[in-house]
Regions:
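Duplex nucleic acid-engaging cores and interfaces of nucleic-acid transaction enzymes
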Residues: 1-218, 222-224
Length: 227
């Protein structure tokens, strides 16, 4: 299902984004040029798109808009999203911190005031406890892997040349990861970990209930029935 959603993502109706506003300013050709990473003078190319009437005041704004478009393009790339999904599944760390000033009131969550562990190894009862602490505004929770390695994975996919255009794409990759891909993947990990924890909790409850229902109602006592 996630893979299908990735394929549909570029065509999904969306609210106004930084990339869509940059496109409205006519900066998409510049973004496409940068993505090709040809040996061009980036500032000279960007200067051609400076247009105060369209809201592009200088070269920096032209390049920023182009990077916004590139960032959205990378975020909507199905292959990149699948790589990030697998990376998060294998390497995400669930971290819990107490809100400053909530230490005394949130004592029942004291075990999670300063806690972290690999998400894939976290037992369901711990995940659910941390989520409750977050919902009750005692804990801050995040589910993230090491950032540098994630960015390196994206750079291996999208960086094709060591030149000024490639440097612009690198900047767009970092922005894409921090602003778009990482929050999206974290949301997925939250949903998946919640579903897994709920299913495990239900399974434990069902087993305990089965034992209770199958137990002798009067304990180990002899019972005589006469018909």
């Amino acid at each position: 299902m996630a893979a299908l959603e990735d394929i549909y993502l570029p065509y999904k109706p969306k609210r106004k984004t930084r990339a869509s506003m940059a496109r409205e300013k006519g900066l998409e050709p510049l973004a496409n040029l940068l993505l090709k990473q040809q040996p061009v003078d980036v500032e000279t190319e960007a200067a051609a798109y400076v247009n105060e009437e369209k809201g592009v005041k200088d070269i920096d704004e032209a390049l920023q808009g182009a990077r916004d478009i590139i960032a959205e393009t990378i975020n909507e790339n199905a292959e990149a999203r699948e790589k990030m999904r697998k990376y998060f599944q294998q390497n995400a760390i669930i971290r819990s911190r107490v809100y400053t000033g909530k230490e005394e009131e949130g004592q029942k969550y004291k075990d999670y005031f300063e806690w972290e562990e690999p998400l894939k190894d976290a037992p369901s009862h711990r995940v659910l406890a941390m989520r409750r602490g977050e919902a009750e505004l005692f804990l801050m929770l995040d589910i993230l892997p090491p950032e540098e390695e994630a960015i390196t994975i994206l750079e291996k996919q999208f960086i094709e040349a060591n030149n000024s255009a490639g440097e612009q794409v690198k900047l767009a990759i970092k922005d894409c990861y921090k602003r778009l891909l990482s929050p999206s993947m974290e949301t997925e990990m939250r949903m998946l970990s919640k579903k897994k924890a709920d299913e495990e909790a239900i399974e434990v409850f069902a087993k305990n209930l089965h034992k209770l229902l199958m137990a002798a109602p009067l304990g180990s006592k002899r019972v005589l029935a006469i018909d």
